[in-house]
Amino acid sequence: MNKMNRLSHNTEIRNAIYSGVGIGISGNSFLLLFHIFKYIRGQRSRHIDLPIGLLSLIHLVMLIAMSLVATDIFMPWGRWGDTTCKCVISLYRFCRSLSLCATSLLSILQAVTLNPRNSCLEKFKRKSPHYMLGCLLFLSVFYTFISSPLATYITAKSNLTSPSFTYITTSCSLAPMSYSFHLTVFILLTSRDVIFVGLMLLSSGYMVTFLGRHKKQSQFLHITSFSLKPSAEKRAMRTILCLMSFFVLMYTLDSIVSYIRSIDDGQIFYCVHIFTAHGYATVSPFLILSTEKYIINIFRSTFGRMVTIILLRNR
């Protein structure tokens, strides 16, 4: 039996992956429904609400595709055909690409919203969510153009005739590529990652610098009108640092594991790669929800009522 096929009998890894995917789907579903509920109720929306809603939708679709991949790895019900392999694997890769783009654009948008109202970016600030939609649409078309040739190398195992095929799932594998094509895809995807991660780091650094400078100015001037702002600034800084830092951490780990897999494509590194690939999509909604005052107040109110009911029953 092939060592990769033994994954289907490893219940500990299977349960861990399914638990992580299930938690991520629940968190992103709740975050998406929360923003839909805010829109239906007509509550005042922030500039980042639409991008966060889009990011949660992207992660939701990505984790659903991941659950299908995990099912074919651990509990295959039947062999997938070429079309199913191409669609599921390509959808997962497409959502991962959009997650990177949306996170980078979200960090840029948050940096823009910190500028004062009389700045030159005020006009852009009002239309920035719509610009982000346009950027995501353009990037979607661009990535589809890049990844379409790559999808032709994803094939069902029933068609395999060479041991040089790379394992993806029980049903699917990646056919060997020519050196020139592999190098072209590598350069394009690496350039994309460097650009968007670089923009993310620059915008996050700008936000931290801006918030720190604003806090020092308010403390130096002792202006009472700023007395309510430090907590909001700290909360915004904490959200930015946590979300972007966690993304960079998971991206770095995923890149390291991907490189190791290119040398040793064993069972252990394959499983670690699964966790690092969807770790950000699983944790990010909870990082965002932890800073939503409205949700925190609901949980506090609900928890307080539950405690009161329990105390009354015990009397």
UniProtKB/Swiss-Prot annotation:
Mutant phenotype after disruption: Mice lacking all but one V1ra and V1rb gene (12% of the V1r repertoire) show a lack of chemosensory response to a subset of known pheromonal ligands and changes in maternal aggression as well as male reproductive behavior.
Pfam short name (any one): V1R
SUPFAM superfamilies: Family A G protein-coupled receptor-like
Transmembrane segments: 16-40, 52-71, 91-112, 133-154, 194-212, 240-260, 268-288
PROSITE patterns linked to this entry: G_PROTEIN_RECEP_F1_2
Residue pairs linked by disulfide bridges in the UniProt entry: C85-C172
Extracellular side: 1-15, 72-90, 155-193, 261-267
Positions on the Cytoplasmic side per record topology: 41-51, 113-132, 213-239, 289-315
GO molecular function terms noted in the UniProt entry: pheromone receptor activity
Described function: Putative pheromone receptor implicated in the regulation of social and reproductive behavior.
Family the UniProt entry places it in: Belongs to the G-protein coupled receptor 1 family.
Name of the protein in its database record: Vomeronasal type-1 receptor 54
Gene (name only): Vmn1r54
